[in-house]
Amino acid sequence: MYFVAGKLGLRLAFVHPSASAVWPPSGIALAALLIFGYRAWPGILLGAFLVNLTTAGSLATSIGIAIGNTLESLVGAHLVNEFAGGRQAFQRARDTFKFTFLAGMVSTTVAATLGVTSLSLGGFAPWTQYGSIWATWWLGDAVGIVMVTPLVILWSSRNHERWTLIRAVEAAVLAVCLLLVSHLVFVGSILAPKHYPLEYLCIPFLVWAAYRFSPREAATAILLLAAVAVLGTMHGSGPFVRPTPNESLLLLQSFLGIVTVMTLAFAAALSERRRAEERAYYLAITDSLTGLANYRRLIEELEAEIRRSARSGKPFALLLLDLDELKKINDARGHLVGSRALCRLADVLRAHCRDIDTPGRYGGDEFAIILPEASATAASQVASRIYEQLARDGEQPVLSVSIGVAEYPHDGETVEALLRAANRVLCEMKRRLHREVT
């Protein structure tokens, strides 16, 4: 992949056969090191060597350039892993900016300096053109890293959101709109040959990709824009066309680099916000000790289940459980053991719940389970399995529970009525057990 991308990139080398303003291999190489680790460096060295050996220069200059490209990737990977979150650099805006500076601006000076110096020492590039060749080399590598590395990293991740049909249609509409506008600005309209500064027309579609999707889709949208923009600019159309092809590409790459960084940072910031909102919501509806639904969520689910059952005419059941003798456990063995007892009971409840059931901590030593489309008889069977599981548990102290059952609508048609009904059964069970013990 490095070799093929390198040969394609050097087809756009105008200031020198070995220096191109469009250099995707730098991004591919850095992505390979971030994904596979530093052990991937021999492949980069070999690919860079073959690309340059089959293009221009001598064996010595090809080795020098290959060493520079490999060191650039190694330095960039080390800096990103150390200071920018490694492969997670595009999940936070702060790390995205760090990645841009460390990998896109700092590490790229290594390849540009070693590469141009090797060519100049070998007599394949005049020293008078050192600055212009170096600038082209550096910018090509920088934009290649900023644009290609995120794309490869994000698509290699397995943590992808599954799209609904509506989501897929929206993505397709976005891609078509972006391609059409990019074509209008850079390629085939009556406006493109006039070089009007219309590149800003593409930005809303990149914002769309970042706002509605993830950094992965934003990086993909940037690639689509870049492909059309480079094609149009090389054919003499678009706002960045100048007297020489290399000057045109340098201006275009500067624009693409800035747009890429801003789009990826915006997408990362939005992704951060979504994760924070999801985390806050999870904490708001989850019991921090047991990981079960908390009182707030239990009441919300109970109200929702009442509405569903009222529409469908199907009953549902509610189990109310009380962990027996929790105070004695706390007094005799300490609160850590008491907390562990609550977690043990929570694990048992999870094990005997269906995916559609909602187990939760009602408060203190009380738990509840909402059983959709279940009768009181079915709920009693679940209660029996919970009793049996606790009796078989070999961990000390031995746990026992009292359980009350209520069925909608037989025992009540409101949240309060169902809870009172289940609590009456639970209290009666406790009294009966107390009489048996005494």
Regions from the PLM with identified roles:
Residues E301, V337-T358, E366:
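Active-site-proximal alpha-helical element of nucleotidyl cyclase-like catalytic domains
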Residues A391-L399, L418-T438:
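Catalytic/regulatory signature loops of cyclic-dinucleotide turnover enzymes
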Residues Y200-L201, P245, L250-S288, R296-R307, ...:
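Signal-transducing coiled-coil linker helices
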Residues D141, D287-T290, L319-D322, G364, ...:
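Conserved metal-coordinating catalytic motifs of nucleotidyl cyclase and c-di-GMP turnover enzymes
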Residues Y281-E300, L321-G334, C343:
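Conserved nucleotide-binding and Mg2+-coordinating catalytic segments in signaling enzymes
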Residues L345-R350, A378-Q396, N423:
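Alpha-helical scaffold within the catalytic cores of cyclic-nucleotide enzymes
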Residues M1-F49, L53, H78, G85-F99, ...:
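Hydrophobic transmembrane alpha-helices
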Residues T358-R361, P397:
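A short pre-motif secondary-structure segment
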